A protein has these predicted regions:
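Glycoside hydrolase catalytic-domain context in secreted enzymes
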Residues: 1-123
Length: 123
């Protein structure tokens, strides 16, 4: 369903997009909404690959989605918006994504305030 939605939004012209679709919230957007800025979704490798990633992979490879938005939460201890394995290794290298990646509102601020993975706000 996501692939068809993306194709409808972006159109079929190879020279330009009608609109830029954005697949979100990459990749393990789970857990209580009230603690989404500090939640750590702990998932097995198998669950990640079989449950959470297939829809995003289809959006990237079949739908040619132009943008991907990272989730607020952490996945296995690492904030999704700064997750090397998810954003670089899987999304870019394995799937060949060439579009742009965006963070959700305040997700970068959450590295320090919500997740506590930095010592200072600047870091």
């Amino acid at each position: 369903m996501g692939v068809r939605f993306i194709r409808g939004l972006q159109g079929h012209d190879e020279n330009y997009l009608k609109a830029a679709a954005c697949a979100k919230h990459f990749a393990v957007h789970s857990g209580p909404e009230g603690i989404r800025h500090s939640f750590d979704a702990v998932v097995s490798r198998q669950d990640l690959r079989e449950t959470y990633l297939p829809a995003f992979k289809a959006c990237v490879q079949e739908g040619k989605v132009e943008a991907v938005m990272g989730a607020y939460n952490r996945t296995n201890g690492i904030p999704c918006c700064g997750h090397q394995e998810l954003l670089q290794d899987i999304l870019r290298k394995e799937w060949g994504f060439e579009g742009h990646v965006v963070s959700d509102c305040w997700a970068i601020k959450d590295f320090h305030e919500g997740h506590g993975v930095t010592k200072t706000p600047v870091e």
